[in-house]
Amino acid sequence: MSETSSARAVDTHCPYCALQCGTRLAGTRQADVTVRPRADFPVNRGGLCQKGWTAPTLLTAPDRLLHPLVREEGGDLVPAGWDAALDRVATEIRRIKEEHGPDAVAVLGGGGLTNEKAYLLGKFARLALGTSQIDYNGRFCMASAAAAATAAFGVDRGLPFPVTDLGASDVVLLAGANVAETMPPLMQHLRTPRLIVIDPRASATAERAALHLRPAPGTDLALALGLLHVAVAEGRCDDAYIAGRTSGFAAAWEHAAGWWPERVEQVTGVPASLQREAVRMLADAGRAHILTGRGAEQHSKGADQVSAYINLALALGLPGREGSGFGALTGQGNGQGGREMGQKADQLPGYRSLTDPAARAHIADVWGVSADTLPGPGRSAYELLDALGTENGPRALIVLGCNPAVSAPRSTRVVERLAALDLLVVADIVPSETAQLADVVLPVTQWAEEEGTITNLEGRVLRRRQLLDPPGEARSDLHVLQGLATRLGAPTAHYPTRPRLVFEELRRASRGGKADYSGITYERLDAGEALHWPCPEPSADAPPHPGTPRLFLDSFAHPDGRARFLPVDHRPAAETPDADHPLIATTGRVLAQYQSGAQTRRVPELDKAAPEAFVEVHPDTAARSGLRDGDLARVISPRGTTLARTRYDHRCRPDTVFLPFHFAGAGRANLITNPALDPKTGMPEFKVCVVRLEPVPESHAGAPS
């Protein structure tokens, strides 16, 4: 039992998105837990979305995993004891490493893992396994924004300012972000600003916009270049800011100079007049923010698209100016902390580069090993999944906190690769679609049953507090990592199971890094301090560092203190419509579901609100395909077919259809999505794939999920 598990109520945070809304949980057993939003937490201020209100329901999911499962020779998963399950995993790992080398064992983590879990997972992979083959599902979420922000500012923090700054803004531009559905409590901070929304869909957020720009999917880069062109051509740039705080403007302008508004209109469909109006609104605002979301980022050129929006923000003098700025809306619950703590293919804790000799030496010293023993960078997430079971790819995969059988692009291929493994191990709270394929399934705790820390979208480190003991034989992921590490010959003390002890090591590992947590302690967090990283440990006689809620006010994180314009130019999406596939499909989230749906599809209230896959389509487009509202449709791309219920929407672009990606089985949107990768980040092109629609004969009609 933990130090807090005997309490009947705890202050903690929602288990879903990166807002990490403050909540208060009460109850003595899983079946009677209640949740209330906390008015004292500034991000949600007493607000909570439908998912947050229903989160306790998942604690008693009918198929909650309560015991380890192992697959018998006959093919069935059957209950087993922890020792037997971990022994089987360790035995297989040793065999595979002996026969194929350490990189034959891979690890895939998740952006919902606590900082402590993400940190220990990276250490486990690189030391206990000795593998370079580790990445996480944040590669499908924040990779583009992270790369662009690091290149421009020298460091990546989703929002380099508190969420509450948005409420005092005059104008906020949202590029590819439908926060009214994906982060509803954030909308209370967007009531005052005039909103500019860039989205091909007439989303719930776009409905509240003062100005809605609707580019064809895959053309954001041309639009952002055009907005920069307008700013320069109409004399709306902040020339003093550009001269005093940035470098590289001339090279960026060289590309934008060729994207005058009328040319942009031809490529994107956005009227030149609206382009000019958007720039006027931003430039005339006393305070303004530009924010990107997955709609701008999940492309084979996602990093360049975010860079183009950053260039616009820099030209207008927004980043590093109090009350204004640029930011990216982190999606997953710990998408920020998850990419800082070492579970990403090319990073070490503290947001250190795995190829930096000084960074390697620092982490090696903390871990008590030689820097030469640390593997180099491995494959990015999709490349890793695509290589599973191949001649030169991993033969074993350990999965914590994600469901790639549903969430990865070209999922038929991914499922085939998972099936080709010698060993698939999945730690989860429910039998997700990936867990159902596993050789060993390990039941782990969820948010109300564990301690730890989470870092939200504004870089604020938060305490997750335990209300209940785990049910059945469920254990923390930290116990899983310790159990496997010790069976592979590592000292038990090197893999603590107490989150507080892991955090103390994490503090030392992050010291001096870009994401410096060394001055943050559980004691300070429990005392109610609001601590945003970087928060370095002070010298012996200095007071505690207060944290850094606003970055870049004095300088940017590059050695010369200047932000960088990045020269980028538009290029088409990886595929464009043709006679066989005349439409563009784009994917995204809906209000009642979350990520792969493994959690929310098990909550009756949420499942009732969004029970099956659908394809949102203009009535004229549907009619040309022989479809009526409510008909079951085949959505066919060059990679495969998904089934979805036709949903008329007169506001849709006639050339574009939309599918949510939360559903499993034949309704998986990722059966059709394109795994074309951004060369800078490994981000797949989730937002653009060419398709055609076909009706499903009545004799074959049924639920698409």
Report each predicted region and the residues it spans:
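Flexible, glycine/charged-enriched surface loops at secondary-structure junctions
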Residues: 101-104, 237-242, 289, 320-327, ...
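Long, contiguous, secondary-structure-rich segments that constitute the structural scaffold
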Residues: 470-531, 596, 600-616, 620-705
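N-terminal export/assembly segments and adjacent metallocofactor-ligating motifs
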Residues: 1-234, 244, 248, 252, ...
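N-terminal leader/propeptide and maturation segments of large enzyme subunits in energy/redox metabolism
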Residues: 76-78, 234-272, 349-364, 369-372, ...
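Flexible glycine/proline-enriched surface loops and loop-helix/loop-strand junctions
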Residues: 208-209, 259-261, 291-296, 461-469
